[in-house]
């Protein structure tokens, strides 16, 4: 087991946000493992999000069906939640299914360093904590323990048979 601050092979994406550059399209410079990647953006003319080089980045959330016991039963097609990732039909609108449509978020460590001029910052996002300046803010349970994932409902909550549910169309 690798503890906090110990080195391991992993990914550290970084970017600099320059407070000295007025043009928003030019404010960001990629650092570390992000160097050479292409930007993600919303293509409003086609109404399709363009992930650039970021589609398979470790921090991308994944839609899934989460069982009542807290285990992922299967992943959903990210472009069509009515299908499982294998292309078969999903249970997103099945109110008798013993689970909920949820978005799974992986553990992410963050570090923010103000630039020397005080006008910008270097921001790092990693899948591990390479030093004590990296913190995992989102994946902490009620006892202060880091968890590999956290989940959020995909759909607005509704009550079905006395249970709060995340089900499509309800």
Where on the chain are the PLM-derived regions?
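Short, polar loop/linker segments at the starts of domains and inter-domain junctions
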Residues: 24-38, 115-129, 161-170
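Extended, Lys/Arg-enriched charged tracts that mediate electrostatic binding to polyanionic substrates
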Residues: 57-133
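Residue-identity detector for glutamine
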Residues: 6-7, 60, 156
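Acidic glycine-/aspartate-rich tracts in secreted/extracellular proteins
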Residues: 20-21, 108-111, 156-159
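A residue-level signal for beta-strand positions that form part of recognition/binding surfaces
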Residues: 12, 102, 149
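Short aromatic-cysteine micro-motif
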Residues: 92-99, 125-170
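Enriched but not universal
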Residues: 1-9, 15
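Intrinsically disordered terminal extensions flanking catalytic oxygenase cores
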Residues: 12-18, 22-86
